């Protein structure tokens, strides 16, 4: 159980997520906006929400208004419960490559997933379109709209091709 310093909360969370032997349960207080990012659903997903939700079951316990503290900070907080998944497809071996795919997909939030992958990975757009379509993903969608299962499918079916050196 922790009240993380807000300026370092994302760093600490990513560090916990990278551990091979994670705590059985994490109850953390975040700045409310960070908690919303961690708990986001398709349509507003971010890199942090995808990787957190791939590795942990997550739920908001409650919001904590700024007036609950003395002196009152400028922001509201939220308490989030994270329980590491035992059955996540992400392992210590594929954690970094999966994050590479997410970074490429979320590299330009206003662009389509196809454009992001093509630009970030220096691959022809037609190749990225083909890989996305083979996974049942419309290349015109944005990364924030993809479901967790779609990210997993894209990684499983396309990672070697996307990141191969030519």
Regions found by a protein language model. Name each.
Residues 1, 8-143, 153-166:
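Class I S-adenosyl-L-methionine
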Residues 150:
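Ca2+-coordinating acidic residues in Ca2+-binding motifs
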